[in-house]
UniProtKB/Swiss-Prot annotation:
The keyword Transferase applies. Belongs to the class I-like SAM-binding methyltransferase superfamily. TrmB family. The lineage of its organism: Bacteria, Pseudomonadati, Pseudomonadota, Gammaproteobacteria, Alteromonadales. Pfam families: Methyltransf_4 (PF02390). The gene is trmB. Its EC number is 2.1.1.33. Keywords: Methyltransferase, S-adenosyl-L-methionine, Transferase, tRNA processing. SUPFAM superfamilies: S-adenosyl-L-methionine-dependent methyltransferases. GO terms for molecular function: tRNA (guanine(46)-N7)-methyltransferase activity. This is tRNA (guanine-N(7)-)-methyltransferase. It comes from Pseudoalteromonas translucida (strain TAC 125). The active site is at residue 146. Gene3D superfamilies: Vaccinia Virus protein VP39 (3.40.50.150). It is an enzyme of class 2 (transferase). It catalyses: guanosine(46) in tRNA + S-adenosyl-L-methionine = N(7)-methylguanosine(46) in tRNA + S-adenosyl-L-homocysteine.
């Protein structure tokens, strides 16, 4: 196991699987609404992906060879569904551990009639380790992850050196890791980790943050934050090696 500084991933390989002792999330089980439960029952056989099935053949999953965008922790899925609807020429994979969010996302996707979205209900780090082939993703998105704002919890932040090194191999050359956070301290942490990570180039002309690109929908949460004077920081790093 690597002994690099603060990491939320203490991993060892055993039989080809990653073993983790520190997780970047706390699983809070909320109640499903009737609509969410119905959407899971109806849509999961078509849109659901299972971690236990192992490595994906993405062209088989989607029935085409379109570029693939993967989002970690999509919450209730509104932005992800909007992106998939606005970009039918791309394929999207969303990963979320909270079942109500999965149900809400499937409900919206079904209502929107989109066919270019697939969903995992599983730990994203394990999905990346076991299900996503190297050089298979055009974009990897991480929007508003848990900031773990207390210093003693910083090791739980998902953006750490080992995690970034793993996802770099899964991005195609020229692929982009796009992050967004409304916690300035976490933005600074992300920037520090990414600047130290080999094989990435910052797409910011000022070598720090980028304006929110049009492709990332503005959420209601974000709009409220803007009205209250809260900042949001986007970071986009391109794989170069």
């Amino acid at each position: 196991m690597s002994e690099s500084s603060n990491t939320n991933l203490e991993q060892a390989k055993q039989e080809g699987k990653y073993i983790r002792t520190i997780r970047s999330f706390v699983k809070r089980e909320g109640r499903l609404t009737k609509g969410q439960a119905a959407a899971i029952e109806k849509c999961w056989p078509i849109m659901g992906l299972e971690h236990k099935n192992g490595m994906l053949d993405l062209s088989e999953v989607f029935g085409n060879n379109n570029d693939v965008v993967l989002e970690i922790g999509f919450g209730m899925g509104k932005s992800l569904v909007e992106m998939a609807k606005n970009a039918p020429h791309l394929n999207f994979i969303g990963i979320e551990v909270h079942r109500p969010g999965v149900g809400a996302c499937l409900m919206d996707a079904d209502e929107a009639g989109i066919t270019n979205l697939r969903i995992f209900e599983h730990d994203a780090v394990e999905v990346l380790a076991d299900c996503i082939a190297d050089e298979s993703l055009t974009t990897l998105q991480l929007f508003f992850p848990d900031p773990w704002h207390k210093k003693r919890h910083h090791k739980r932040r998902i953006v750490q050196g080992e995690f970034v090194e793993k996802l770099r191999s899964q991005l195609k050359m020229g692929g982009v890791f796009h992050m967004a956070t409304d916690w300035e301290n976490y933005a600074e942490h992300m920037l520090e980790v990414m600047q130290a990570a080999p094989g990435f180039k910052n797409q910011s002309t000022t070598n720090d943050y980028v304006p929110r690109p049009d492709l990332r929908p503005l959420t209601k949460f974000e709009q409220r934050g803007h009205r209250l004077g809260h900042g949001v920081w986007d970071l986009m790093f391109e794989r170069t090696k």
